[in-house]
């Protein structure tokens, strides 16, 4: 018992947590079927109703101002890269201010990179000294954000990297070949490390609404299929917090144990980024599309190619029309400030959502091929919302299937529009879209 107590104290885990880490051996003996709990099913519905979240890629890589992959793309030596942690002191970071900014923008949740591929942990982890507490800052970033989210009623999601470019026990995949680490691949020890960290995140930071995994694709070119044992990990998460949703950015069809289907830089079904392939779109799971506000995920000082507010608002509408949430990314600066242009875009999105939010939040997607790329639709029960995304539209020739079309009004003004019925089909006429309008919404009852 003394040895067990010592190990538990050394790792910072409770006895219950330690037993949970031993659960994979039992999980392998269970069937692959996954039956989500009642809490989980409710959480899925709540998540789908939120429709808009903020992705935050922030770590010591922000000091290089070259994006979150700089350890890989810059072919840096890992030991030299790690020294930058000694300079990480985000003196302007204010979690409450961040969350207020996101809330004012109309976002309902955040997803924060607790540990990216460079292995640096942004919380007070006991599993590695390579963390925020061993920088000059010495404050738990994850705790600050978690507390701010809980105080403001903002959903809290944690990004967690499956792959690691620093640890010697991580089995080398198709990335991370240039860091100079000593390779001693042992997936069992690495798997235990990840599970111990996940246990910390799910026991020390209050309610966590989702875990967002990334990096599974690092072994997609192995000659022998790599067994990540993700189902065991998913089961661990669901035991620790049954309502916590699991998503994995693996670019594959959903797997047993997952609660969200994720799409990277891709509105579901469009495969514009080439990551979705033949994965299809789940008809049972909530969906989420993540996209950058400029070009990079992490802060890159030279990347000032921000999408316009019009583009972002239209992306939000298109995503909602597919029945999906939009997770919009921001790469905070190393000093703890949010980039000025990003804040400006958030303000513009928030202004639009204050006036048009009922056409986004709590809605379902609508199949409406007739609209092409000019008009998309969402619905809430028998109320349909026609999102006009091009300024030259003057009429809607055909309403979506199931739309009775008894009354049509401009959502923001209440102005009534004429509904015309010809040969059994209803159309809306007399539409005048303001020149600078990103998304002109017509509410049809």
Predicted regions and their residues:
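Mature catalytic domains of secreted/periplasmic carbohydrate-active enzymes
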Residues: 28-445
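N-terminal secretory signal peptides that target proteins for export/translocation
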Residues: 1-7
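Eukaryotic non-globular interaction segments with acidic/serine-rich, low-complexity composition
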Residues: 2, 20, 415-416
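Bacterial N-terminal signal peptides
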Residues: 11-23
């Amino acid at each position: 018992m003394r040895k067990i107590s010592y190990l538990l104290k050394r790792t910072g885990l409770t006895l219950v947590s330690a037993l949970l880490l031993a659960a994979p051996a039992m999980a392998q003996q269970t069937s692959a079927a996954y039956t989500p709990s009642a809490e989980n099913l409710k959480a899925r519905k709540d998540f789908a109703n939120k429709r808009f979240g903020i992705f935050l890629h922030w770590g010591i890589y922000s000091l290089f101002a070259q994006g979150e992959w700089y350890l890989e793309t810059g072919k840096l030596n890992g030991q030299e890269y790690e020294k930058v942690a000694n300079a990480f002191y985000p003196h302007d970071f204010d979690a409450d201010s961040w969350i207020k900014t996101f809330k004012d923008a109309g976002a309902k949740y955040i997803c924060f990179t607790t540990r990216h591929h460079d292995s640096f942990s942004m919380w007070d982890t006991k599993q590695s000294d390579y963390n925020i507490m061993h920088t000059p800052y010495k404050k738990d970033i994850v705790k600050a954000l978690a507390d701010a989210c809980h105080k403001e009623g903002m959903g809290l999601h944690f990004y967690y990297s499956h792959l690691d470019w620093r640890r010697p026990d991580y089995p080398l995949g198709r990335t991370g070949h240039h860091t100079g680490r000593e390779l001693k691949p042992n997936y069992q020890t690495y798997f235990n490390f990840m599970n111990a960290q996940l246990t910390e995140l799910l026991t020390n930071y209050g309610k966590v609404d989702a875990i967002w995994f990334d990096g599974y694709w690092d072994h997609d070119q192995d000659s022998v299929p790599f067994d990540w044992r993700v189902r065991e990990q998913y089961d661990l998460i669901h035991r620790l917090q049954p309502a916590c949703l699991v998503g994995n950015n693996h670019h594959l069809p959903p797997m047993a144990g997952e609660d969200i289907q994720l799409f990277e830089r891709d509105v579901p079904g469009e495969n514009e980024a080439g990551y979705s392939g033949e994965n299809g779109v789940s008809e049972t799971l909530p969906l989420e599309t993540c996209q950058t506000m400029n070009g990079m995920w992490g802060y890159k000082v030279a990347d000032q190619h921000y999408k316009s507010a019009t583009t972002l608002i239209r992306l939000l509408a298109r995503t909602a029309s597919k029945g999906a949430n939009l997770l919009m990314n921001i790469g905070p600066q190393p000093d703890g400030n949010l980039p000025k242009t990003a804040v400006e875009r958030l303000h513009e999105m928030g202004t639009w959502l204050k006036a048009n939010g009922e056409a986004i939040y709590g809605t379902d997607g609508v199949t409406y091929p007739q609209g092409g790329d000019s008009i998309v639709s969402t619905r809430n029960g028998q109320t349909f919302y026609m999102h006009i995304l091009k300024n030259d539209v003057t009429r809607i020739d055909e309403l979506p299937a199931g739309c009775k079309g008894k009354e049509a009004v401009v959502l923001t003004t209440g102005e009534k529009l004429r509904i015309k019925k010809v040969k059994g089909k209803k159309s809306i006429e007399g539409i005048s879209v303001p020149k600078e309008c990103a998304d002109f919404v017509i509410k049809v009852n």
